[in-house]
Swiss-Prot record:
Protein name, as recorded: Inner centromere protein B
Record InterPro entries: INCENP_N, Inner_centromere_prot_ARK-bd
PANTHER family assigned: INNER CENTROMERE PROTEIN (PTHR13142:SF1)
Region (Disordered) residue spans: 50-124, 160-182, 255-286, 305-470, 502-555, 569-687, 702-760, 797-819
Low complexity compositional bias, start-end: 90-99, 332-343
GO CC list: chromosome; chromosome passenger complex; cytoplasm; kinetochore; meiotic spindle midzone; microtubule; midbody; nucleus
Source species of the chain: Xenopus laevis
Bias (Basic residues) ranges: 60-69, 316-326
Free-text note on domains in this protein's UniProt record: The INbox mediates interaction with aurkb/aurora-B.
GO molecular function, a single term: protein kinase binding
Function of the protein: Component of the chromosomal passenger complex (CPC), a complex that acts as a key regulator of mitosis. The CPC complex has essential functions at the centromere in ensuring correct chromosome alignment and segregation and is required for chromatin-induced microtubule stabilization and spindle assembly. Acts as a scaffold regulating CPC localization and activity.
Assembly: Component of the CPC at least composed of survivin/birc5, incenp, cdca8/borealin and/or cdca9/dasra-A, and aurkb/aurora-B. Interacts (via C-terminus) with aurkb (via N-terminus and kinase domain). Interacts (via N-terminus) with birc5.1, birc5.2, cdca8 and cdca9. Interacts with mtus1.
Major localization listed first in the record, in broad terms: nucleus
Keywords in alphabetical order: Cell cycle, Cell division, Centromere, Chromosome, Chromosome partition, Cytoplasm, Cytoskeleton, Kinetochore, Microtubule, Mitosis, Nucleus, Phosphoprotein
């Protein structure tokens, strides 16, 4: 038996773990996969202008985004094309609200309708008092199956075209799935996939409790509400307004039934009875409905965070203006019933109203749970608050249109309805004022679970506050903006523009006139005091603005040197200004003052603690300073000792260096003495060698002179012998010539004799002997040429001047023998003598005078003094002129 229980327990644990795993897959991993698929589709779509929103932008990309205009039209941009002003003034809040509502309409049509946890409902003092008397309503059980959910009757207004398409879709769905039967007319936009997603979101698996969001100045300003989407001319664009008519909690299954949208062509505003109406301001600040599976892109992208910050800023500015007007209305207690009725008419005056049947229970309000903030969202960017879609009536009676004339007919002053209408108006106005003051007056039970709101007790007309004129103009502006935001198709025939102000003077005068007068005087006094306070605040604001202008001027002077820090400082200053403004407005309520006092006490404690820490730190620093001083003194002493030791070492080193220098100087002196001795010895040796060389040269010269004298004598003797030989030869030549002359004369005489004898004797038979004939011996046939006897030249004269062309001489076999003085000892002696005793050319030839250029170039013409050359002429410097030759130096 124990084993069976263990097995069953194990199966239960396994099933629970499996369900938790499946739920984790559905709620976490599938969401990530769907987001990744969505981003992939965006990336691979044809629209490449869209930037991935998961990536953060740098400041330069933000500035470039503002400057660069896209060629393709951007559906998220303002159609007017004007730049959004960064100032949070009351002049342009309506345009920003209009842009936000248009973006919410576009995003609401693109995203699938999913269920999300509701926001915590703010509890006012009246709600807290009412919650004590009335216990909270018990939640109904969730539907068990999708068929039970679909069998709920939902009232949807559709057009004729949508009705035909819905019928066709219904027939197709009946053929495909015969089990799917419902009374709801299908709409083309709402398919089975959407219904299955809704059922999965509200299915049986238990959802873990989400911890409540801590109450902070940022979170406490967000009011809870229901979102009701009214139809427009097209089923794609729907107007989103906030329905705040329901006060009691509503079961979760009714929230699922609220998902189908109203797609009628006529616009409607959420107005129930007059007692259940809320301020028109709440209908403007709307938010997109998001689910528990909210898009990660909208949660973590910078674009969504910037949009949420813009919405929060607009909403805070609206709440600030409302709180100011509320403070003025609370201080001034005007008791006129006409102001009461006019204020009621200002609150509930709208273009068209859509009311619920009288039988509809007013307690059906869904219970709102606190939404957990994402851990990845920063303090600057807040996650979107999830607003549930308002509940449609479960009654079978269809919604009916009510105009102002119908309300006036219903509100005719009968004895029964007059008091009811007055009470309803009182309740409506008190509830509107309470709802407007939710953000500025938090109650003690703000974090407690919401309870049912009981109607306030009847309020006399004297307690109702007349709104100031600027609120009337504000409501007029709201109505005009609502009218401008509508599409042309959404304006039907039943829409009529009425005035906000209605003069509803009460019929019965109040009998307590004296009390009223006293209250009126008190109200006037309070109003004057409030006016004085307002003027003082205005003066303070002016002073603060002057100080801010002064700071801005100083910033403008510093921005040239601090270009990069200036942008960050401006952003920080803007953020601080907004925070200061919001903090100043929040400080008007007593709760904030109490918190501030508590904070001041805590600050005093922290300051005391900080002072103690500073004193302790100062003591520690003093001790550390003393210890450091001691260490410094010790370090200085060690340093002085080191310096003294270093000086002593330097002195020893200097003495060593001086001793070394002395030793080196002594060695140098000894070396110089030794070198001088060596030089003297070498000089003496050189002089000895020179003397020996001179003596040897002298001996050689003497020997050469002797040889030369001997050669001269031999030459003279040779000349004498030659002279004698020449004279003897001349004498012999004369004798020979004289003998020849004598012989010739004798021959001539003999011939003459023979000729004479021949002439006398006969010549015919005479035989002549040629050999012995004197004719043959009379002359020579070829006489020898006469040669001039060559005179014997000087042996030292080699005819170098005459025969200077010796290039053909062979050095090994010269034509003339080399003389003795050109080789051998004579040549060496001549060279050594010329080396040691050079010839004094100046003494031999005299001093050579420098040439005078005036004498060489005696022409003087003007054109000679002009330089016609393009070259740059520079005279040589005077310091270099002594290097020039004497003959080439210029004389000045």
């Amino acid at each position: 038996m124990n084993d069976a229980e263990c097995l069953s327990h194990l199966l239960q644990v396994c099933s629970r773990k499996t369900e938790e795993f499946v739920r984790t897959l559905d709620t976490k991993h599938m969401v990530w996969l769907l987001e990744i698929e969505e981003e992939a589709r965006k990336m691979f779509s044809s629209d490449f202008n869209a930037e991935p929103e998961l990536m953060p932008k740098t400041p330069s990309q933000k500035r470039r985004r503002k400057k660069r205009t896209s060629i393709l039209p951007d559906e998220n941009r303002d159609p007017s094309g004007r730049r959004i002003s960064r100032r949070r003034s009351s002049a342009n809040w309506s345009s920003s609200v209009r842009r936000l509502s248009v973006r919410n309409q576009i995003k609401a049509n693109d995203d699938s309708i999913q269920e999300g946890p509701a926001q915590p409902k703010r509890m006012t003092r009246a709600r807290a008092q009412a919650s004590i008397m009335c216990p909270p309503a018990v939640e109904q059980a969730l539907p068990e199956s999708p068929s039970q959910l679909c069998q709920k009757s939902v009232q949807v207004k559709i057009s004729e075209h949508e009705r035909r398409s819905a019928e066709q879709k219904l027939r197709e769905s009946e053929i495909e799935d015969s089990e799917m039967k419902t009374d709801v007319q299908p709409i083309p936009e709402i398919t089975k996939d959407h219904i299955s997603e809704i059922m999965n979101a509200a299915g049986p698996p238990p959802i873990p409790d989400i911890p409540a969001v801590p109450v902070t100045p940022e979170n406490k300003s967000r009011a809870a509400g229901k979102l009701k989407i009214s139809g427009s001319s097209t089923p794609i664009q729907t107007a989103a307004v906030v329905d705040l008519t329901c006060e009691s909690p509503r079961p979760a299954n009714e929230l699922v039934n609220e998902q189908p949208l109203n797609l009628s062509n006529e616009s409607a505003t959420p107005t129930g009875s007059k007692s259940d109406r809320r301020s028109v301001r709440r209908s403007l600040v709307v938010r997109k409905s998001s689910s528990r599976r909210a898009s990660l892109v909208s949660q973590f992208s910078l674009v969504s965070k910037r949009e949420s910050m813009t919405r929060e800023a607009v909403r805070k500015s609206i709440r600030q203006s409302i709180s100011k007007k509320k403070a003025a209305m609370e201080t001034s207690s005007t008791s006129s019933q006409r102001s009461c009725h006019s204020s009621i008419e200002m609150v509930d005056d709208e273009i068209t109203i859509k009311i619920r049947p009288e039988t509809a229970p007013s307690e059906t309000v869904s219970e709102e749970a606190p939404a957990a903030e994402s851990p990845r969202s920063s303090l600057r960017s807040r996650a979107f608050k999830k607003i549930a879609i308002s509940n449609l009536s479960e009654s079978e009676e269809p919604p009916r249109r009510v105009t102002r004339q119908m309300v006036a007919v219903d509100a005719e002053p009968t004895p029964e309805t007059a008091d009811d209408a007055q009470n309803n108006r009182r309740k409506s106005y008190k509830r509107a004022v309470d709802e407007l003051s939710d953000d500025e007056r938090p109650s003690e039970g703000e974090c407690s679970p919401p309870r049912k709101k009981t109607p306030s007790p009847p309020c006399p007309p004297s307690k109702i506050v007349k709104p100031p004129p600027h609120m009337k103009s504000f409501l007029h502006t709201v109505q005009k903006n609502q009218f401008l935001m509508m599409t042309p198709g959404s304006i039907g025939k039943n829409i009529t523009l009425k005035s906000f102000i209605k003069r509803n003077t009460p019929l019965k005068p109040d009998p307590k006139s004296e009390e009223k007068e006293r209250q009126r005087l008190d109200a006037l006094r309070k109003k004057e005091e409030a006016e004085l306070q307002r003027k003082q605040k205005i003066e303070e604001g002016k002073k603060r603005k002057q100080e801010e202008l002064k700071l801005r001027r100083e910033d403008r002077l510093r921005k040239v040197l601090q270009a990069r820090e200036r942008v960050e400082q401006l952003e920080e200053e803007k953020k601080k200004k907004f925070e200061q403004k919001f903090a100043q407005i929040d400080e008007k309520s007593e709760k904030v003052r109490e918190d501030r006092m508590a904070e001041e006490k805590a600050k005093k404690k922290t300051m005391v603690k900080k002072q103690e820490e500073v004193e302790c730190r100062r003591k520690q620093e003093e001790e550390a300073r003393k210890l450091k001083a001691k260490q410094m003194e010790e370090e200085e002493r060690r340093h002085q000792e080191l310096l003294q030791k270093k000086r002593e070492e330097e002195e020893m080193e200097r003495q060593k260096k001086m001793a070394e220098a002395k030793r080196l100087a002594e060695q140098e002196r000894e070396r110089q003495v030794f070198a001088e001795k060596e030089r003297l010895r070498a000089e003496r040796e050189r002089e000895r060698i020179e003397r020996e060389k001179a003596l040897q040269l002298q001996r050689e010269l003497e020997r050469a002179a002797q040889e030369k004298e001997q050669q001269r004598r031999e030459a003279e003797e040779r000349k004498k012998r030659e002279q004698q030989q020449r004279l003897e030869q001349e004498r012999l030549e004369r004798l020979r010539t004289e003998q020849e002359v004598k012989r010739l004369q004798e021959e001539q005489q003999r011939k003459a004799k023979e000729q004479a004898a021949a002439a006398a004797a006969p010549v015919m038979n005479v035989t002549v002997d040629m050999q012995n004939s004197p004719a043959c011996e009379s002359y020579e046939m070829t006489p020898k040429s006469y040669k001039v006897p060559s005179v014997k030249a000087n042996a030292d004269n080699y005819g170098m001047d005459l025969n200077s062309d010796d290039s053909t001489d062979d050095e090994s076999q010269p034509r003339k023998p080399i003389p003795a003085w050109a080789s051998g000892n004579l040549l060496a002696q001549a060279v050594s003598q010329q080396y040691y005793k050079p010839i004094d050319a100046d003494h031999m030839y005299g001093t050579i005078d420098s040439p005078k250029l005036e004498e060489l170039f005696n022409k003087s013409k003007p054109r000679y003094f002009k330089r016609t050359s393009s070259a740059v002429w520079h005279s040589p410097p005077l310091s270099n002129r002594h290097h020039l030759a004497v003959g080439y130096g210029l004389k000045y």
